[in-house]
Amino acid sequence: MESDGKSDRTKVPTAASSLNEKKADLNDQPGHSTDTEGNGSDNNNTQVGEKHHVSADDGPVDTAPVELAATQHQHPVEAEQNYPSGLKLTIILLALELAVLCVALDNTIVATAIPEITNQFHALTDVGWYGSAYLLTLCAFQLFFGRLYQLFSIKWVFLSCLFIFEIGSLICGVAPNSTALIVGRAVAGLGAAGIFSGALIIIAFSTPLEKRAIFTALISAIFGISSVIGPLLGGVFTDRVTWRWCFYINLPIGGVTAVALVFFLNIPPREAQPDTNETLRQKIMHFDPIGTAIFLPCIVCILLALQWGGTTYAWSDGRVVALLVLFGVLLITFVGLQFWMGEDATVPVRIVRQRSVGSAAVFTGLVGASFFIMVYYLPIWFQAIRGATATQSGINTLPMMISTTVGNIVGGVFVSFTGYYTPMMYALPPMASVGVGLMTTWTVDVSTGKWIGYQILFGLGLGLGMQQGIVTAQASLPVADTAIGTSLQVFAQMFGGSLFVSVAQNLFSNEVIKGLAAVDELGMTPQAVFNAGATELDNLFGSNPSLLAEVKVVYNDAVIWTFRTALITTCLSVLAVIFVKSGSVKGKKIEMVAA
């Protein structure tokens, strides 16, 4: 290259000369343009994979970024990453599974302890809040923690969430009254909001993309299994020790998890963290505090409206109407704010507008709805129709949970070996919808073979594609957005579950009340029968077999309506899959240090 008065910039060591030659070669190719003379062009700053502007004054430089820029334009590129392996990886995975175990257990373990809790605190009217307080904060803060994971140390954000969760569990364990228990549940939910998504984010930074699906499946399988064994464990603690151990159990498990991660988890520092020279106000604005303040009551309003409407209050009641109107106003405000905040939004709009990511979130939400509806209402069917205890009903749902776990693992292995994640997403709707569709044919005297077989078909289909939305997000987004993309998928799953469980609860309670009102010689009000609980039917009507049979038919029909809701959400999930771009994780590398 000849001197033109800028020889001080062009006479550089060999590596820089090689870099300029490579850029010149790229200029000769259609669609490529580079600027080596610093004439105002910004190309050097925008090349995929580069971290800073390259000039001759920088001395020897690595030519790899330019080579990669010529071959990859859609996805960042992964430098060689020293992922943990062997015993270290095993310990990290076990620690994450223990953390997820606590979160999932806490979601359902309280169910069988509620009767004893209400007896001790004399607070039957607070029953709904024992579960709702946990779910409300878990859903509402899910996206907020996604933002924290993007901006700060993943390891310490996760450990902070675990600490908050443990504090909440401790408050619940020592609660002297119902109000303290509800506060503890809300605090535990706040910590739980960052644990499940955080575990998946840590997996993303600890394993190569092509193997990530199988590890994600293992984490998700633990969540599903724990959700079912929760009531079993809660019943054992309540009967044999005290209900307070439903919460104390989280303390030693969380302690082991924290120690393991402190010593074995090491994620490189990321360049996406806030500038230390920023003012306090600038740092705070990175968290979108206004958006969070709007989003929290928005979620609370819709979940409360669905829980109260048609049961506690009529749909026309002013309180329910006000909640729905307020939800709509807050949602519109939140969405508008996300556009206005740009990159400082809780969820930058460009991420949601990425077709595969947005569609995967809808898919994950609908599948989460199907899963949680069945987790909650299958035990009710066994308790009301078959007279099973809480423990027995949990055992009877094992065919679904085991097959879901197997499906999760099979789906993860398939993606790891083939690289393609969309086939498993397409496999879910037909298999799962046939399974749950057959379950809507259940009658009071359905055979054991049918209720086992139909559960297996539904669970296997659900498991195959249940977590592929998370894989889709991680494969479709640059690693700097992995935390938010993962949190978005987890939020969709949790919120979809919470939303449609409330819808199913409305259908169930209304159908029971309506059906019981048509039963002759009931001897008590339909509401009184409903409030007594599904496990009390044999005690209430056991002396009159024909009346008991009639009441069980009413409960069977009501539960079937919840199964139909799961059938609808399962079928609708195929519409979301259509918009997910087919892709492979094979050979798709991600630059981990840039996150």
UniProtKB/Swiss-Prot annotation:
Keywords for this protein: Cell membrane, Glycoprotein, Membrane, Transmembrane, Transmembrane helix, Transport, Virulence
Entry keyword annotation includes RNA-binding: no
Annotated transmembrane regions: 91-111, 126-146, 156-176, 186-206, 217-237, 245-265, 290-310, 320-340, 362-382, 409-429, 451-471, 483-503, 559-579
UniProt cross-references to InterPro entries, sorted A to Z: MFS, MFS_dom, MFS_trans_sf
Location, primary (coarse class): membrane
Domain of life per record: Eukaryota
Biased composition (Basic and acidic residues): 1-11
Location within or outside the cell: Cell membrane
Topology term for the membrane: Multi-pass membrane protein
Entry's Gene Ontology cellular component terms: plasma membrane
Composition bias type Polar residues, residue spans: 30-48
Glycosylation site residues: 39, 44, 177, 277
Region (Disordered): 1-62
GO molecular function, one term: transmembrane transporter activity
Keyword field contains Transmembrane: yes
Function: MFS-type transporter; part of the gene cluster that mediates the biosynthesis of the phomopsins, a group of hexapeptide mycotoxins which infects lupins and causes lupinosis disease in livestock. PhomT is likely to be involved in the cellular export of phomopsins.
Family named by the database record: Belongs to the major facilitator superfamily. TCR/Tet family.
Protein name: MFS-type transporter phomT
Species this chain originates from: Diaporthe leptostromiformis
